[in-house]
Amino acid sequence: MNPVFTPNVAQKILFIDRDGTLIEEPVTDKQVDNLAKLVFEPQVIPALLRLQKAGFRLVMVSNQDGLGTPSFPQEDFDAPHNMMMQILSSQGVKFEDVLICPHFNDENCSCRKPKLGLVKDFLTQGFIDFTQSAVIGDRHTDVELGNAMGIISFQYQRGSLGWNAIADALLNKGRSATVVRTTKETDIRVTVDLDNASKGTINTGIGFFDHMLDQIATHGNFKMEVNVDGDLEIDDHHSVEDTALAIGDALRQALGDKRGIARFGFSLPMDEAKGECLLDLSGRPFIKFAAQFEREKVGEMATEMVPHFFRSFADGLRCTLHVAAEGDNDHHKVEALFKVLGRALRQAVKVEGDVLPSSKGVL
């Protein structure tokens, strides 16, 4: 087991080739076996620093043909390799692990890329966030390794896909997610895009509920697509509950590791009805709901499902949520609750920097 990574804690990891990717690969003999051959690839250190700052952890994965044999003595490898590691470390670049296959191709070992031997622990111990991790290397075998691991890959080429371009591609992935939730009672598809304020399509089969979900997206300033096929011939319970779970889950996935977000949100608009929302994207589901309704339904939506929506939403998003409403009109009170949730979300998901807003180092 790798002591640097915690089992079953999925993290953003970049598996990076060495020769031809981090440093130049000599054209003549393909071996970096003395200090004179040690030349870094352009922009590699600034790019790695950007990626580290965004929460990526770095692992080096390299084939070194015949390492430790007369054709490539260990001491010839060590001098330039150790200097490379010292330079990287002096500039703030930290590789959590260095994985090397020393075998020739014809030895048919299990660890030579693109085989999975070198990264077996990462795959079996639950270290990898498969949605955000990647392989970076200059050869097609690196691409094949990424395919075998089930993560994306970037085939480095100094002229056409250099380090700045790779870092940009990894860092500028939109904060969006799609969740499909299918049960015996409902078939639901939710897509959220936190960095897109255009209007989405919402169709739950419950007109008033559609209007309320639109309030969340509109006041949250993000795009949300919701399509629900539920057992409305019975009642609205399953449709509302499962939709809330799916929306919360989609928002949680879109937020990723939450690095740079404000984390907290608060809203207290005052109209005929007062709605209040305190939100903490804490990773821990908790709900405190305070509102009373006189009517059994608002539109086609049962008012008893309003607190249930917020509880299920908090479970799906894994957030701490305090919501309350006061007023004389049930329609206005319900609408105030959904509006303030959207407003609080707008504050909480806003990117303000690149630091994880938690003393624990995880949310």
Curated annotation (Swiss-Prot):
The reaction(s) annotated as catalysed by this protein in its Swiss-Prot or TrEMBL entry are: D-erythro-1-(imidazol-4-yl)glycerol 3-phosphate = 3-(imidazol-4-yl)-2-oxopropyl phosphate + H2O; L-histidinol phosphate + H2O = L-histidinol + phosphate
Active site as annotated: 17, 19
Region spans: Imidazoleglycerol-phosphate dehydratase: 175-363
| Cofactor(s) listed in the protein's UniProt record | Mg(2+); Zn(2+)
Main subcellular localization, coarse class?
Answer: cytoplasm
Q: Where does the source fall among the domains of life?
A: Bacteria
Listed A to Z, the keywords are: Amino-acid biosynthesis, Cytoplasm, Histidine biosynthesis, Hydrolase, Lyase, Magnesium, Metal-binding, Multifunctional enzyme, Zinc
Its localization reads: Cytoplasm
Which Enzyme Commission number(s) are listed? 3.1.3.15, 4.2.1.19
The biological process GO terms on file are: L-histidine biosynthetic process
Q: In which pathway does it act?
A: Amino-acid biosynthesis; L-histidine biosynthesis; L-histidine from 5-phospho-alpha-D-ribose 1-diphosphate: step 6/9; Amino-acid biosynthesis; L-histidine biosynthesis; L-histidine from 5-phospho-alpha-D-ribose 1-diphosphate: step 8/9
Of the GO CC terms on this record, one is:
cytoplasm
MF annotations from Gene Ontology: histidinol-phosphatase activity; imidazoleglycerol-phosphate dehydratase activity; metal ion binding
Q: List ligand-binding residues for Mg(2+).
A: 17, 19, 138
Residues covered by region (Histidinol-phosphatase) = 1-174
The residues the record assigns to binding Zn(2+) are 101, 103, 109, 111
Give the family per the record. In the N-terminal section; belongs to the histidinol-phosphatase family.
PANTHER family xref list:
IMIDAZOLEGLYCEROL-PHOSPHATE DEHYDRATASE, IMIDAZOLEGLYCEROL-PHOSPHATE DEHYDRATASE HIS7
Name-wise, this protein is Histidine biosynthesis bifunctional protein HisB
What gene is this protein a product of? hisB
